[in-house]
Amino acid sequence: MPRLVVAAAIVDSLDNPTQLLCAARSYPPELAGKFELPGGKIDRDEAPLQALHREIREEMNTAIRVGAQVMTEEGTWWPILQGRTMGVWLAELAPDAPAPTLNGSHSEFRWTPLDKVDTLDWIGCDLGIAMAVARTSGFEPADR
């Protein structure tokens, strides 16, 4: 059975989101430069939210405050690469957390207006999630 994956849709404010923090992959070569939501695999005996906080610390050197879970229209986790499924939560940077810093997993972090998330070069499965985040926040990407 494939491992489960978690990701954070980090917005500028859980109360009034207008921007999404998008992360460009550093590797593997076929995904380098493509954007994704930060996160990663759930370790054995680890709860999903524990994994989410750990992954954000490891990938971004920061901390988050977690909000509502973002589900598919069917109310399930999101299907992603290699037959895995991903749980996604809205989040914002924790009040006293340092700004995210690059540490090798990503080549760039970019705050993107929610109505423009579809203008980035996303890993295919993450584009639909980013657009769902935008729509649930009251924005309608052009879906170019």
Identify the meaning behind each predicted range.
Residues 1-20, 41:
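Conserved N-terminal beta-strand and adjoining loop/helix that marks the start
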Residues 11-16, 28-29, 43-44, 91-98:
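Short, charged/polar surface micro-motifs in flexible loops or helix N-caps
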Residues 17-62:
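Conserved Nudix-box catalytic region and its N-terminal flanking loop in Nudix hydrolases
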Residues 32, 101-144:
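Nudix hydrolase/Nudix homology domain
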Residues 40, 54, 67, 112-115, ...:
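Structural detector for helix-capping/boundary residues
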Residues 1-3, 15, 30, 81-83, ...:
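A generic fold-level signal
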Residues 3-4, 63, 68, 73-99, ...:
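Active-site-adjacent beta-strand/loop module that shapes the phosphate/pyrophosphate-binding cleft
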